[in-house]
Amino acid sequence: MTANRLTLSGTVCKTPTRKVSPSGIPHCQFVLEHRSVQVEAGFTRQAWCRMPVIISGKAHQAITQSITVGTPLTVSGFISSHQGRNGLNKMVLHAEQIELIDSGD
């Protein structure tokens, strides 16, 4: 088996969409914005990305109901390519684990 794991923390930056497939599987899709400072070759650099995320299954329904724009999260799962309506491929993080980050309020 080939490794395909990604853990990314960030803030939800687009309103989540929730749908149920014809087979009854709930899906929640949103975009996670990540910003951090990383060290590469001994130098610091700004790291930034926006990653589309999809989380599926009834086991995750409760946590996805609390996700809104601005919610800080850590998401773990695998990445896969999805083809959009415009014919372009984009990387999507298929979440298998999701954690709300306590903002300390």
From Swiss-Prot:
- GO biological process terms on file: DNA replication, synthesis of primer
* Keywords noted in UniProt: DNA replication, DNA-binding, Primosome
* InterPro entries cross-referenced by the UniProt entry: NA-bd_OB-fold, Primosome_PriB/ssb, Prisomal_replication_PriB
Gene3D superfamilies registered for this protein in UniProt: Nucleic acid-binding proteins
SSB domain residues: 1-102
Q: Name the Pfam families for this protein.
A: SSB_1
Q: Which PROSITE patterns match?
A: SSB
Presence of the UniProt keyword DNA-binding in the record: yes
| Any one GO molecular-function label of the UniProt entry | single-stranded DNA binding
A single GO cellular-component term from the record reads:
primosome complex
- Tell me the protein family, please: Belongs to the PriB family.
Record text on subunit structure and interactions:
Homodimer. Interacts with PriA and DnaT. Component of the replication restart primosome. Primosome assembly occurs via a 'hand-off' mechanism. PriA binds to replication forks, subsequently PriB then DnaT bind; DnaT then displaces ssDNA to generate the helicase loading substrate.
What's its job? Involved in the restart of stalled replication forks, which reloads the replicative helicase on sites other than the origin of replication; the PriA-PriB pathway is the major replication restart pathway. During primosome assembly it facilitates complex formation between PriA and DnaT on DNA; stabilizes PriA on DNA. Stimulates the DNA unwinding activity of PriA helicase.
What's this protein's name? Replication restart protein PriB
